[in-house]
Amino acid sequence: MAENQYYGTGRRKSSAARVFIKPGSGKIVINQRSLEQYFGRETARMVVRQPLELVDMVEKLDLYITVKGGGISGQAGAIRHGITRALMEYDETLRSELRKAGFVTRDARQVERKKVGLRKARRRPQFSKR
């Protein structure tokens, strides 16, 4: 492992991302694929780039990411959280800027479990008066 490599773990919903950052040209590799190949949706790509754009490091750092679990939106959120943590390890002065944007806080919202006697978590079966 390189000495000038920084690491951050990000989580969102049921996804977990491991993010490695090192100085480079702005290459983003997710599970051995490019950002454009991995995420078909432009919104997911935007979410991933947000912390880098905020601190103007898009072309200064290379990112190597492995992500598991969940769907597209959860994985994008987990990667964003991981990048934020790795950036804070890289330069602690970025913390306040990232905190202000709301990237440092882990989004703790999870899927609510289905209850017995209900159709979904809160959706009740149709009620018939007669």
UniProtKB/Swiss-Prot annotation:
GO terms for molecular function: RNA binding; structural constituent of ribosome. GO terms for biological process: translation. Signal peptide: none annotated. GO terms for cellular component: cytosolic small ribosomal subunit. Belongs to the universal ribosomal protein uS9 family. HAMAP family: Ribosomal_uS9_B (MF_00532_B). PANTHER family: RIBOSOMAL PROTEIN S9 (PTHR21569), SMALL RIBOSOMAL SUBUNIT PROTEIN US9M (PTHR21569:SF1). This is Small ribosomal subunit protein uS9. It comes from Edwardsiella ictaluri (strain 93-146).
